[in-house]
Amino acid sequence: MHISKPAGPLPAPVPFYRQLYFQVVVAIVLGALLGHFEPAFAESLKPLGDAFIKLVKMIIAPVIFLTIVTGIAGMTHLKTVGRVFAKSMTYFLFFSTLALIVGMVVAHVVQPGAGMNINPAELDQSAVNTYVQKSHELSLVGFLMDIIPATLISAFVDGNILQVLFVAVLFGIALALVGERGRPVLSFLEALTAPVFRLVHMLMKAAPIGAFGAIAFTIGKYGVESLVNLAWLVGSFYLTSLFFVLVILGIVCRLCGFSVLKLIRYLKAELLLVLGTSSSESALPSLMEKMEKAGCEKSVVGLVVPTGYSFNLDGTNIYMTLAALFIAQATNVDLTLGQQITLLAVAMLSSKGAAGVTGAGFITLAATLSVVPDVPVAGMALILGVDRFMSECRSLTNFIGNAVATVVVSRWENALDRDQLSLALDGRAPPLQAPVPPPDAVAPVSAR
């Protein structure tokens, strides 16, 4: 694969204070301080975080649609689509299962809930009833049927990632099958990609404001002190996720010829955004763009990233088995090996419906415990207060897992420019887009 060289010299480095990751860090620190010292006012800033996430969700559907359609329509052989999808699902299934097992093993070794001796009958279940009610709406058949939208337009109106993915794949295949007659449509969609991604860049400038509001609300409402009683569970989850990313995914990255630490550094701005908003979905458009810049083919990025947001949730899977066994230990429920295998199997299925939105992990945990009656659902009240703090770690782990999956599947498919990947991870790749000249410097375009 040929690497095109920039037409001119690279622009001067952007000062650190103008870089997104620095601005997000400052916003998170200021938001945390405000939440601690002025909790009442900080709680009122929740709309800032919510508004930013809504802005990002607004652009996700067009980004996914354009990336997938132009990628598939540009493929020489349509068999490639099925092959990439099959490889992606194989990867997702293996590592999702591994994450569930890791969470279960850590729960047995660390025993975070041992000695609490909680009586489930004495717990206030009213706080978790909302989540349990939502979890009853989750089922495998319902999840699969929900992938098919009521109309082509409703997929975009509802912003359902899997529905948009479904429509985009079908439209991309149809566009490829009509051949030259579809060339004008493909050219239009490729031209439309530029302003859509420019809009993504514009929205990302509001990331510090969104992160500030979200973290201020979190600290103001729940307080840092709410972590103390369940610090052992929270600490176990963070350390387990760190182990999964640095060791397990680190080994995978090393076998594929790159460093997971360099990948994390490459995605630092997006990771800080995910940290501030507790939603991996907030950085989805940027992740897709950066994976293309890192040498992954557009068609692979368009299929792997959106699919991974529902099927490759490593952080959520670790959380589900760890939290379920914590509740079992805290309520003195001794699970047999068969019951634990059942728990793992149910968690595997229920986790597939959890998209990268805040609170999805807690809902899928409720779905799992509702199906496995051995662990009391009322025990979820024990972790409700600290679940919001574990949400950040879930989202970060999910995000990194999907970035690694994109590179691995691209390499597996021989659709990875390794030289470009090295340049990007070393910080030597050209910027995502060239600076836009002022209006008076734009030359008129002659008609062709």
UniProtKB/Swiss-Prot annotation:
GO terms for cellular component: plasma membrane. The chain crosses the membrane at residues 20-42, 51-73, 88-110, 138-157, 161-178, 198-220, 230-252. Residues 432-441 have a biased composition (Pro residues). Keywords: Cell inner membrane, Cell membrane, Membrane, Symport, Transmembrane, Transmembrane helix, Transport. It is found in: Cell inner membrane. It comes from the Bacteria. The keyword Translocase does not apply. One of its GO terms (molecular function) is succinate transmembrane transporter activity. PROSITE patterns: NA_DICARBOXYL_SYMP_1 (PS00713), NA_DICARBOXYL_SYMP_2 (PS00714). The keyword Lipid biosynthesis does not apply. GO terms for biological process: L-aspartate transmembrane transport. It is a multi-pass membrane protein. Residues 428-448 are annotated as: Disordered. Gene3D superfamilies: Sodium:dicarboxylate symporter. Responsible for the transport of dicarboxylates such as succinate, fumarate, and malate from the periplasm across the membrane. PANTHER family: AEROBIC C4-DICARBOXYLATE TRANSPORT PROTEIN, PROTON/GLUTAMATE-ASPARTATE SYMPORTER. NCBIfam families: PRK01663.1 (NF002461), PRK13027.1 (NF009587). Belongs to the dicarboxylate/amino acid:cation symporter (DAACS) (TC 2.A.23) family. This is C4-dicarboxylate transport protein.
